UniProtKB/Swiss-Prot annotation:
Assembly behavior: Homodimer.
Protein name in UniProt: Bifunctional protein FolD
Gene behind this protein: folD
CDD domains documented for this protein: NAD_bind_m-THF_DH_Cyclohyd (cd01080)
Family: Belongs to the tetrahydrofolate dehydrogenase/cyclohydrolase family.
Organism of origin: Tropheryma whipplei (strain Twist)
Length: 295
């Protein structure tokens, strides 16, 4: 058995079409959605990802602006830039590209973003809404994973799902999202201090690997027919043509055991970008409704 592909490119294309129509409707009502991205330093992977986000904006019709800051930018200076964007009436959504230099407290910067402009959905208030089940802005990658599985008609309700990794951008919010009333799955959150990791993973109907460790999930960790979602993107050198070699958290031979598996390129990545664009549109629509009711 060779696993079927969870095609994030195909699913995201449909989402982008819907978002383009929504953007046109907003513009017809005098609203121009705009995303502001802050990039600190010159990390090649971060720069590439930021540019792809801005291409998505252009294709959908969302305005975008990129604020580039040097790697030696202080935490105070970065937060000051964020506060300027918070006060800008023409900015619908804000993202600060992660990771940040070690000298900057990532959490403080995220907390400085206005929750009503938090396009990444990582502000503590929006994460709190996720915990309580209140409608809010959901972190992009967790939302994208659920959409990807739903698009392939994979039932999640009542299923056991192993989430390998407990980071604040994917693992933790994904576990909350999956166990909430909207999805109703049973979640096992596996991390570096978990015991019998392979055994816990092997009982899961769905395994989501978001540990950020190359090929940590071995074929022996997967029960036959399970669904595998590979979130990991690890840089493993450069090819002879000069292209970056990317590997996932899941060993390639896992495809011979799983029923479905997401590719490292064209799997979760496009879905994350689609959910970011969706968040920007949602924030714009929310702001439009507020202004409409206030008038």
């Amino acid at each position: 058995m060779v696993a079927k592909v969870l095609d994030g490119l195909a699913v995201s294309a449909g989402i982008f079409e819907r978002l383009h129509r929504a953007c046109c409707e907003l513009e017809n009502n005098g609203v121009c959605p705009k995303l502001a991205t802050v990039l600190v330093g010159n990390n090649p992977a971060s720069r590439s990802y930021v540019l792809s986000k801005h291409r998505d904006c252009k294709n959908i019709g969302i305005q975008s602006t990129l604020i580039e800051l040097p790697a030696n930018t202080s935490e105070k200076e970065l937060i000051s830039k964020v506060e300027i964007l918070n006060a800008s009436s023409d900015v619908s959504g804000i993202i600060v590209q992660l990771p940040l230099p070690e000298s900057i407290d990532q959490n403080k910067v995220i907390e400085a973003i206005n929750p009503d402009k938090d396009a990444d959905g990582l502000h503590p208030l929006n994460l709190g809404y996720l915990v309580t089940g209140k409608q809010g802005i959901v972190p992009c990658t967790p939302a994208g994973i659920v959409k990807l599985l739903e698009a392939h008609r994979i039932t999640l309700e009542g299923k056991t799902i192993a989430v390998i990794g407990r980071g604040t951008t994917v693992g933790r919010p994904l576990g909350i999202l999956l166990s909430g009333k909207g999805v109703n799955a049973t979640v096992i959150n596996i991390h570096s201090r978990s015991r019998n990791i392979s055994g816990l993973s092997r009982i899961a109907d769905v395994v989501v690997a978001c540990a950020g460790v190359k090929h940590i999930v071995e074929p022996s960790w997967i029960k036959p027919g399970a669904v595998v979602v590979d979130v990991g993107i690890n840089q493993s050198g450069v090819s002879s043509s000069g292209k970056m070699i990317l590997t996932g958290d899941v060993h390639p031979l896992t495809k011979n055991i799983a029923s479905y598996i997401s590719p490292v390129v064209g799997g979760v990545g496009p879905m994350t970008r689609a959910m970011l664009m969706s968040n920007v549109i949602n924030l714009s629509e929310r702001d439009f409704r507020k202004r409409l009711y206030a008038s």
